[in-house]
Amino acid sequence: MQDIKTYLSVAPVLTTLWFGSLAGLLIEINRLFPDALSFPFF
């Protein structure tokens, strides 16, 4: 039962960090390369 409580307390933290870093990465990519619609035409 303790393992389940540990998992339930760790999983939201890891997913928040993961999605936060993913959002930051996408924001930086869009800042460096503003028009992502032009990528398929290169």
Curated annotation (Swiss-Prot):
The chain crosses the membrane at residues 7-27. It is a single-pass membrane protein. Disulfide bonds: none annotated. Keywords: Chloroplast, Membrane, Photosynthesis, Photosystem I, Plastid, Thylakoid, Transmembrane, Transmembrane helix. It is found in: Plastid, Chloroplast thylakoid membrane. GO terms for cellular component: chloroplast thylakoid membrane; photosystem I. GO terms for biological process: photosynthesis. Pfam families: PSI_PsaJ. Its main location: plastid. Belongs to the PsaJ family. May help in the organization of the PsaE and PsaF subunits. This is Photosystem I reaction center subunit IX. The lineage of its organism: Eukaryota, Viridiplantae, Streptophyta, Embryophyta, Tracheophyta.
